Amino acid sequence: MARGALDWIGAELEALDAKGLRRSLEPIGPAQGPVVQVGGRALVNLCSNDYLGLAADPRVRAAAADAAMRFGAGSGAARLVAGDLPPHGALEARLAAWKGREAALLFGSGYHANAGVPGALVGRDDAVFSDVLNHASIVDGCLLSRAELVRYRHCDVEELAGLLARTRARRKLVVTDAIFSMDGDAAPLRELAELCDRHGAMLYVDEAHAAGVLGPNGAGLAEALGVQDRVDVHMGTLGKALGAFGAYVAGERRLIELLVSRARPFVFSTALPPPACAAALAALEVVATEPSRRTHLFALCARMQAGLARLGFDVARVASPIFPVVLGTEARALAAAAALRERGWFVRAIRPPTVPHGTSRLRVALSAAHDAAQVDGFLAALAAVLPDLPPAGPRRAG
């Protein structure tokens, strides 16, 4: 029975509908992959973060199944109570070695890590400097820390330098995505590391969309740019390129020891399920032994980038498997997604507040499980639907 106290929700949902901003769930099946079943139809999946195609890899699945039989389906408690099982420590050691750090700590999700770690490092007398296009979880974590939140223009090192020079904060924390999830471009980590060294600031890098994809060993953008030792807090996820679930922070041992006591999402959450840890360990082995996956992925990326540029989209700054097809209005993005679906392509419309107003888009994401024919087919389908979209202003990246 509906309760009167919730009657206001109907008007809120109608307002979201009117603005083209109402979200809805859309089940896929039977498993994550380059082609999925959606609404009874087989569609090419271009909106997953499964960048290496490992979510359904038989070795990753088998590792998860074996761990479920050996250690159970769930951990049963927080790590600090009775939930610290062998797969947790094994995965943390492997992640620390992969990132070239002394230690690592697992979190329930990337959102958990970003929401909790800043508050363990800074507080009321401190300041956090955050790229204006950082992920929502970073923004929320900065706000929860109660430090002063200073947002600098996207990748604007010059503006950040001035802000750091003027601050009188006790502690300073610079936070950035490595790869920005809605634009696919890369943070200027070398320059940010230089600024942090100069001003005595801590550098926190979210490698969610870079770990597994970039760098000689797939360890992320910091590895690719040779600045791993200059990043204080390496955050990454297990549910994107690694195809599993969860997140981690890697860094100096003293940092990890502090987070064990002060990172509230770690302290007050049930530990990651053992099958998720085992799946991530198996995925890390694939990353280490099959660099050809990354080579193939970036060959597809070059093909997609060239094709989108020919269609007039600004993708010159893209440095990842993420391509923003910016269409402007919510109506155009929704119409494009619907038209592409009719032609066999599954790509979702991304709208405010996820992206700024006026930059609604299709977020196209490639996987090593895709092939060149699928890239070419999508580009042809996109070219065919563009003329029939509602009118809008010039296309520009967000």
Curated annotation (Swiss-Prot):
Catalyzed reaction equations: 6-carboxyhexanoyl-[ACP] + L-alanine + H(+) = (8S)-8-amino-7-oxononanoate + holo-[ACP] + CO2
Top-rank EC class of the record's enzyme: transferase
Pfam (any one): Aminotran_1_2
Cofactor(s) essential for the protein: pyridoxal 5'-phosphate
Chain sites annotated for binding substrate: R23, H135, T354
InterPro entries: Aminotrans_II_pyridoxalP_BS, Aminotransferase_I/II_large, AON_synthase_class-II, AONS_Archaea/Proteobacteria, AONS_Proteobacteria, PyrdxlP-dep_Trfase, PyrdxlP-dep_Trfase_major, PyrdxlP-dep_Trfase_small
Domain of life the protein comes from: Bacteria
Keywords of the record: Biotin biosynthesis, Pyridoxal phosphate, Transferase
Signal peptide: none
N6-(pyridoxal phosphate)lysine modified-residue sites: K240
Pathway terms, separated by semicolons: Cofactor biosynthesis; biotin biosynthesis
EC id: 2.3.1.47
BP-aspect Gene Ontology terms: biotin biosynthetic process
GO MF term set: 8-amino-7-oxononanoate synthase activity; pyridoxal phosphate binding
Binding site for pyridoxal 5'-phosphate: G110, Y111, S181, H209, T237
CDD domains: KBL_like (cd06454)
Family, per entry: Belongs to the class-II pyridoxal-phosphate-dependent aminotransferase family. BioF subfamily.
Job of this protein: Catalyzes the decarboxylative condensation of pimeloyl-[acyl-carrier protein] and L-alanine to produce 8-amino-7-oxononanoate (AON), [acyl-carrier protein], and carbon dioxide.
PANTHER family with a match to the protein in the record: 8-AMINO-7-OXONONANOATE SYNTHASE, CLASS II AMINOTRANSFERASE/8-AMINO-7-OXONONANOATE SYNTHASE
Binding partners and assembly: Homodimer.
Protein name, per record: 8-amino-7-oxononanoate synthase
Organism expressing this protein natively: Anaeromyxobacter dehalogenans (strain 2CP-1 / ATCC BAA-258)
